Amino acid sequence: MAALRAEPEPEGIRDPDRGQDLAESGDFGRANPAFAIVAKDAPRGYAEMARLSEAGALVRAGRRGEAVQIYKAVAAGDSGPLRGVALIRAGWASVEAMPRHDLETLLAPLTDPANPWRHAAAEILAFSDYHSGAIADAQKQFQALADDKDATETMRRRAAAMAAFLKEGGLRNYGTVPEPVPPAGGPAPPPTGTPQP
């Protein structure tokens, strides 16, 4: 009887947490290749999770376009829960840059009334309207989400807060605070109401 020999594991498989450790330390340049190794060589479930982690590291590194492509690929290859996760993450990663129509197309598989991801997709679409300045539409959608008894309590509270915020005018400047005076020779400061870093 031949002796059983263990085949060597690929580098990424020996330390599958390396990518996560690097990402958590902020070293996205080294985290992405580590996730890619696991995604390439690990069994399917681990590979898909590594791809989602790789895309998350790309988002944090400011490489949203690349991340969205990975999220879309994961969604295209999965019909279960990972598909929903991937599409929601793709939606949030692109909500500020993608036209509303394209965002609707991206999230369409999740908006069916029987889909458990429908509330998360609705929140992204409402935020898209808010971000693009369609405040009345955003307020209406956030209120509908807040009133939806099937949504989670956390999501309903968050949607209710956004609906109330938008109903009261959001970040509109009512003139109660004078606009900042730009410094001599320097760039103008942001308008009143703009969040500061």
Model-predicted segments: where are they?
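Short, well-ordered turn and helix-capping elements at secondary-structure junctions
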Residues: Q20-A23, A114, P191-T194
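Low-complexity, polar/amphipathic intrinsically disordered segments that mediate membrane, lipid-surface
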Residues: P187-A188
